[in-house]
C-alpha cells in the first residue's frame, strides 16, 4: 500500500485505518503521512512485525532526503543522544524571505504561489507539522515510548517579524524554527523532552545557512559526535521519490 492521504495531526485518520488494515493483512506499507506514524509509531511497527509486513515512512520527514534509510543503518552500534532539526521547508523559506525584507504576509503568499505552503498553512506556521516530525524522529532514533502532541512544547513562527529576522542576521547568525529532543531520562515518570520553537543560532551552527526550503538535522551520538544531514524539505517530486524508494526497498526484500 502506498498511503499518502492528507495528514491529520489529531487522530491520524483516515490514513491510520488504511495502514492498520493493510498491515493486518500482511501487506507492506510505504507512507508519506506523518500523522499515523507520529501518533501510533510503536503500534504500527508491532502490527507489521506480527504479520510479516514492512512499514516504511521515509517521506514523512525531510521529503526526499534519504534520512531514515541512511541514518538508521548508519547508527547501528551507536546511541543517538539528541537531535536538532529544521524540518519545515515552508517556514524556512518564509524566514529567508523575511531576512531580505519581505513582510510575513508577503513571504507566506510567495510560499503559497511556489507551492511550498498549503492554502490553509496553519499546521506549518503554528509548528504542528514540525512537532509531528520531531515525534517520529524521537521514537525512531532516541528510544522514546509512545508520545502525543501534548508531550511537545510547540511555538510556531507567527510571532516572527522581518525586523527580528534581519537583526539575527546582523548579529552574525540566523533564526530558525528548531525541533529538538534529547534521549529520555530513566525512570517511569521521566517526561519526554521534545520542543519546537524559533531560536537564534550562531553562524557556525550547521543549520544556520540552510537556503530556501532546505531542511537539516544534526544528530549527537555517543561515538561519532555530531552527524548532519541536509536536503530539500518540501516538494511533490521529492516526496514522491521517497515513496518510490520505499516501494523499491519493499519489493527488493520481498523477492
Language model segments and positions:
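Short glycine-rich anion-binding loops that position phosphate/pyrophosphate groups of nucleotides
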Residues: 6-8, 35, 88, 199-201
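Rossmann-fold NAD(P)-binding glycine/threonine-rich loop
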Residues: 7-25, 32-72
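ATP-dependent carboxylate/acyl-activation modules
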Residues: 204-255
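Substrate-binding/catalytic subdomain of NAD(P)-dependent oxidoreductase enzymes
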Residues: 97, 108-216
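Conserved active-site and cofactor/substrate-binding residues in soluble primary-metabolism enzymes
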Residues: 14-17, 39, 62, 66, ...
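General beta-strand structural signal in soluble alpha/beta enzymes
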Residues: 2-3, 30-32, 55-59, 82-85, ...
Amino acid at each position: 500500500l502506498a498511503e499518502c492521504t492528507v495528514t491529520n495531526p489529531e487522530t491520524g485518520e483516515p490514513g491510520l485505518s488504511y495502514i492498520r488494515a493493510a498491515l493486518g493483512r500482511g501487506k507492506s506499507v510505504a507512507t508519506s503521512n506523518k500523522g499515523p506514524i507520529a501518533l501510533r509509531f510503536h503500534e504500527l511497527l508491532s502490527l507489521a512485525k506480527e504479520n510479516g509486513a514492512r512499514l516504511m515512512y521515509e517521506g514523512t520527514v525531510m521529503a526526499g532526503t534519504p534520512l531514515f534509510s541512511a541514518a538508521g543503518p548508519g547508527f547501528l552500534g551507536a546511541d543517538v543522544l539528541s537531535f536538532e532539526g529544521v524540518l519545515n521547508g515552508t517556514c524556512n523559506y518564509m524566514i529567508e524571505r523575511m531576512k531580505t525584507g519581505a513582510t510575513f504576509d508577503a513571504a507566506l503568499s510567495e510560499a503559497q504561489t511556489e507551492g511550498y505552503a498549503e492554502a490553509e498553512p496553519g499546521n506549518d506556521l503554528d509548528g504542528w507539522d514540525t512537532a509531528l516530525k520531531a515525534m517520529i524522529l524521537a521514537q525512531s532514533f532516541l528510544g522514546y515510548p509512545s508520545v502525543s502532541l501534548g508531550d511537545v512544547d510547540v511555538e510556531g513562527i507567527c510571532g516572527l517579524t522581518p525586523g527580528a529576522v534581519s537583526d539575527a542576521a546582523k548579529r552574525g547568525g540566523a533564526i530558525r524554527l528548531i525541533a529538538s529532543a534529547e534521549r529520555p531520562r530513566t525512570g517511569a515518570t521521566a517526561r519526554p523532552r521534545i520542543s519546537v520553537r524559533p531560536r537564534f543560532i550562531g553562524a557556525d551552527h550547521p543549520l544556520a545557512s540552510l537556503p530556501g526550503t532546505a531542511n537539516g538535522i544534526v544528530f549527537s551520538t555517543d561515538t561519532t559526535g555530531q552527524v548532519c544531514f541536509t536536503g530539500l524539505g518540501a516538494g511533490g517530486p521529492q516526496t514522491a521519490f521517497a515513496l518510490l524508494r520505499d516501494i523499491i526497498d519493499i519489493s527488493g526484500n520481498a523477492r
